[in-house]
């Protein structure tokens, strides 16, 4: 959410953000509704002033004038009461439009329509040079008996998965490694819920706009979040912190759920795109200072790259264009990790800086050293999302006999084992 005063004073900048982010919003309609609401509030305030002035006249009025003044007060009160529903309706309508206003991208963000217009910044790590025909993720899992996609589909339908044996241990290992890695870098580990209220998804910016991707529990006013960012973002909703309490840095672990409503037919096979997964999410609350925010952005990015380097996985860093960065973000980078069977990089991490856009929605402010109340800035980035990360892990580290080499960083979490599986080819 942007400051309404900023929108009034900078309509061209907001209109351009709406255009380059492909947001369906009529800014002229919003501004007209704002003017109408201001006029209605002024009318209400004038009537309240008149009613208060009239009330002061009643005790001093003559017996002849008093009944008329009393009646006038009643009439004004009734008129004000009649305006209350109209005032609430106009306030709610304006708020719903304000929730759709996108943030202003930082200078230098490439303008584009979708992911095809994203810009590659760099590549890291060497691509594997196999001297054998490599298997894909599903072939590795099935040959080792590490997954049962057929049976779990009877339980949960498509886009579900069941890991067994070493693959299940590998998933736990990589998640624990990510939590330890981030904890050692000063991030507080959180084990948080995926069950959230609707306003929590509004606070994070997923609503309005992403309703089709979210599971809702029938009979309850609860939904299933797709990332720990959602509940963490609302932990301090409505609170006032002091400047010395910031920054707050978290490594949030949670189950995550996504309906993948817009992904029909894409990545149905295997572990890339599933409805339920586990995720470690980096989340930062910092002061309302863009320079500080950008430093945290680089740190979150460095953490994600450090995790992938420790896992010995080749990857590339992408700068997202305006049309592929989401409404609330001023800057966004994706990290894509190499998947040998597809001969391409696949997204595994998204690093985002949102300025005060989320904090305005949650009402989270802090008092600076001068006593001024400011909205905090928020950032987030994936730590590890599983089982997706298992795809490049299994494929890049497979060996000629069908076993999988364990990266050194994960061996302490797997009893010191250097290889998973049995020779199957």
From Swiss-Prot:
- Report the InterPro entries cross-referenced here: aa-tRNA-synt_IIb, aa-tRNA-synth_II, aa-tRNA-synth_II/BPL/LPL, Ser-tRNA-ligase_type_1, Ser-tRNA-synth_1_N, SerRS_1_N_sf, SerRS_core, tRNA-bd_arm
Localisation: Cytoplasm
Locate the residues binding L-serine: 227-229, 281, 382
GO cellular component, as recorded: cytoplasm
Q: GO molecular function, one example?
A: serine-tRNA ligase activity
Q: Does the keyword Ligase apply?
A: yes
- Report which superkingdom the organism of origin falls in: Bacteria
Kindly name one Pfam family recorded for this protein.
Seryl_tRNA_N
Q: What class of enzyme is it?
A: ligase
GO annotations under biological process? Answer: selenocysteine biosynthetic process; seryl-tRNA aminoacylation
Metabolic or biological pathway: Aminoacyl-tRNA biosynthesis; selenocysteinyl-tRNA(Sec) biosynthesis; L-seryl-tRNA(Sec) from L-serine and tRNA(Sec): step 1/1
Q: Which UniProt keywords apply?
A: Aminoacyl-tRNA synthetase, ATP-binding, Cytoplasm, Ligase, Nucleotide-binding, Protein biosynthesis
> Per the similarity annotation, which family is this?
Belongs to the class-II aminoacyl-tRNA synthetase family. Type-1 seryl-tRNA synthetase subfamily.
Against PANTHER family, the record matches this protein to: SERINE--TRNA LIGASE (PTHR43697:SF1), SERYL-TRNA SYNTHETASE (PTHR43697)
Q: How does the entry describe the domains?
A: Consists of two distinct domains, a catalytic core and a N-terminal extension that is involved in tRNA binding.
> Partners and quaternary state?
Homodimer. The tRNA molecule binds across the dimer.
| Official protein name in the record | Serine--tRNA ligase
The source organism is Deinococcus radiodurans (strain ATCC 13939 / DSM 20539 / JCM 16871 / CCUG 27074 / LMG 4051 / NBRC 15346 / NCIMB 9279 / VKM B-1422 / R1)
The gene for this chain is: serS
């Amino acid at each position: 959410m942007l400051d309404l005063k900023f929108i009034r004073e900078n309509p061209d900048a907001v209109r351009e953000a709406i255009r380059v982010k492909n947001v369906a919003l009529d800014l002229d309609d919003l501004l007209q509704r704002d003017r109408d609401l201001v006029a209605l509030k002024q009318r209400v305030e004038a009537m309240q002033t008149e009613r208060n002035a009239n009330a002061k006249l009643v005790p001093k009025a003559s017996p002849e004038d008093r009944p008329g003044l009393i009646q006038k007060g009643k009439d004004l009160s009734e008129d004000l009461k009649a305006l209350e529903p109209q005032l609430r309706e106009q306030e709610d309508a304006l708020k719903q439009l304000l929730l759709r206003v996108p943030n202003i991208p930082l200078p230098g963000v490439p303008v584009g329509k979708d992911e095809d217009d994203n810009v590659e910044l760099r590549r890291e790590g060497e691509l594997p040079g196999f001297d054998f025909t490599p298997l894909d993720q599903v072939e590795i899992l099935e040959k080792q008996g590490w997954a049962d996609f057929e049976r779990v589909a009877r339980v949960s339908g498509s886009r579900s998965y069941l890991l067994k044996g070493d693959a299940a241990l590998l998933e736990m290992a990589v998640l624990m490694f990510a939590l330890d890695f981030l904890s050692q870098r000063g991030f507080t580990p959180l084990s948080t819920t995926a069950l959230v209220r609707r306003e929590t998804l509004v606070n994070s910016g997923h609503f309005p706009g992403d309703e089709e991707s979210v599971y809702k529990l029938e009979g309850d006013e609860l939904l299933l979040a797709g990332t720990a960012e959602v509940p963490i973002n609302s932990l301090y909703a409505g609170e006032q912190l002091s400047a010395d309490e910031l920054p707050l840095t978290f490594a949030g672990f949670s189950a995550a759920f996504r309906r993948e409503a817009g992904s029909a037919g894409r990545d149905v096979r295997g572990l890339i795109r599933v409805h339920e997964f586990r995720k470690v999410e980096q989340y930062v609350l910092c002061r309302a200072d863009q320079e500080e925010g950008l430093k945290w952005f680089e740190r979150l990015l460095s953490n994600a790259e450090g995790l992938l380097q420790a896992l010995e996985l080749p990857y590339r860093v992408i700068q997202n264009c305006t049309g592929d960065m989401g409404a609330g973000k001023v800057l966004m980078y994706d990290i894509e990790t190499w998947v040998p069977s597809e001969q391409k990089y696949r997204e595994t991490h998204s690093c985002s800086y949102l300025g005060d856009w989320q904090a305005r929605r949650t009402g989270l402010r802090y008092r600076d050293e001068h006593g001024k109340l400011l909205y905090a800035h928020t950032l987030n980035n994936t730590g590890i999302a599983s089982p997706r990360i298992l795809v490049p892990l299994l494929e890049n580290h497979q060996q000629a006999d069908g076993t999988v080499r364990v990266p050194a960083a994960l061996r302490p979490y797997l009893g010191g084992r250097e290889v998973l599986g049995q020779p199957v080819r």
